Amino acid sequence: MSGLVALCRARASASSSLFNSVIRPAFRNFSTGFADTQNKSLVAQMKEEMLHMDINSMIGSSMPLGMMRIGTIIHNIEMNPGQGAKMVRAAGTNAKILKEPAKGKCLIKLPSGDTKWINAKCRATIGTVSNPSHGTKKLYKAGQSRWLGIRPKVRGVAMNPCDHPHGGGEGKSKSSGSRGRTSVSPWGKPCKGGYKSASVKKKKKRLAEAAAKM
């Protein structure tokens, strides 16, 4: 009986020593590796959260121009504070902030390439308007434009003089004379930009000031 008890004790001690020498170190290595990966993923997650916490660089954020950084791409820009977005709203367009606010105004580069001073309290949205390929869409038949609600447009040169200023004459002439006539609406208003109402002197002065500050 005593011999059987001694044999059981020897087997138990051998199994415990085997566990301590082989299985426990492997389990310890596995647990430490898992903890390291957890710590690494936690650090990476914290860095990512810190980057995304910066509201000034988040696409879609709307805020006053004075709170944005230089070089920020923006759209949906107000002309006057609280008026609502008036500029840079077409598909795929964007503007850029060129300078820090000076005297309560920010210098903005518009999609046309022109620069404009806008009140720093005016709000804008960070990012570019979606659907940049809107202008490249091709209509394969006239019916597609009708699906979009666009009705046919008759050219002015194809009308009679009583219906349009471009009408009448021989061939496709818009009017008589050596130089012809600029394109106008059916009511005689220039249709390519309308009448220029801005003062030429003020426009030249504004462009000179913008060039001097660049």
Curated annotation (Swiss-Prot):
Region of interest (Disordered), ranges: 157-214
Positions with biased composition (Low complexity): 174-185
Localization terms from the record: Mitochondrion
Entry GO CC: mitochondrion; ribonucleoprotein complex; ribosome
Biological process according to GO: translation
GO MF terms held by the record: structural constituent of ribosome
Transit peptide, start-end: 1-30
First-listed, main subcellular location of the protein, grouped into a coarse class: mitochondrion
Record keywords, A-Z: Mitochondrion, Ribonucleoprotein, Ribosomal protein, Transit peptide
Keyword Magnesium in record: no
Record's keyword annotation contains Ribonucleoprotein: yes
Stretches with biased composition (Basic and acidic residues): 163-173
Subunit structure: Component of the mitochondrial ribosome large subunit.
Family: Belongs to the universal ribosomal protein uL2 family.
Remarks, miscellaneous: In Arabidopsis the N-terminal part of this protein is encoded by a mitochondrially-encoded gene (AtMg00560), while the C-terminal part is nuclearly encoded (this entry).
Protein's UniProt name: Large ribosomal subunit protein uL2my, C-terminal part
Organism: Arabidopsis thaliana
